[in-house]
């Protein structure tokens, strides 16, 4: 018999993690492109090169850190990922040169797009045997929701606050 209460919790966990993976997704970080370029005085090409390099390095590190999910209980691994995303977001708000921008984008891509989505997908895939496809499609609605909500919210907040806030 399937415990629906636990199933719901796992789906909610996956949904939340895929939603917050958006902090490292291109659609989200792209919202900060113009204010960062203007403040740092860099071109589209320079920003693109930094972004591409940071993405490649974050994907390489994900190969090593991602497999650690098999060595730790999910509560500890997920807590690590949450703290890392929080610290990455905090670090991102202090960017004031291209070197910090490189590290900031790397951290956001690694913790958000990389580890948050990896953690949600791996956890849900492990838990669901029969309805794995349904469960995964449900949790990935979290990213679709973020793609709808966050650009509107961030654009509105840019009117009131600096991009660093």
Predicted regions and their residues:
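Pair of pore-lining "gating" transmembrane helices in MFS-fold secondary transporters
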Residues: 6-28, 106
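Hydrophobic core of transmembrane alpha-helices in multi-pass small-molecule transporters
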Residues: 19, 99-115
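Residue-level signature of mid-helix packing/kink "hotspots" within the transmembrane helices
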Residues: 27, 55-63, 147-148
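Helix-to-loop junctions at the C-terminal end of transmembrane segments
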Residues: 61-73
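Cytoplasmic membrane-interface "Motif A"-like loop-to-helix N-cap segments
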Residues: 70-82
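C-terminal ends and interior cores of transmembrane alpha-helices
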Residues: 83-96
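Intracellular juxtamembrane helix-capping segments at the cytosolic ends
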Residues: 114-128
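Helix-loop-helix hairpin linking two adjacent transmembrane segments in secondary transporters
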Residues: 143-165
């Amino acid at each position: 018999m399937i415990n629906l209460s636990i199933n719901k919790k796992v789906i909610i966990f996956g949904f939340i993690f895929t939603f917050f993976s958006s902090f490292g997704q291109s659609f989200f970080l792209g919202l900060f492109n113009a204010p960062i370029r203007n403040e740092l005085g860099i071109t589209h090409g320079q920003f693109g090169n930094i972004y591409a390099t940071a993405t490649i390095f974050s994907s390489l590190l994900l190969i090593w850190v991602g497999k650690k999910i098999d060595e730790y209980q999910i509560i500890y691994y997920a807590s690590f990922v949450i703290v890392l995303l929080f610290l990455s977001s905090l670090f991102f708000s202090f960017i004031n040169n291209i070197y910090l921008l490189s590290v900031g984008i790397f951290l956001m891509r690694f913790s958000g797009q990389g580890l948050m989505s990896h953690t949600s997908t791996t956890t849900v895939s492990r838990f669901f045997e029969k309805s794995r496809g349904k469960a995964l499609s449900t949790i990935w609605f979290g990213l679709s929701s973020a793609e709808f909500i966050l650009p509107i919210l961030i654009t509105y907040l840019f009117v009131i606050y600096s991009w660093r806030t």
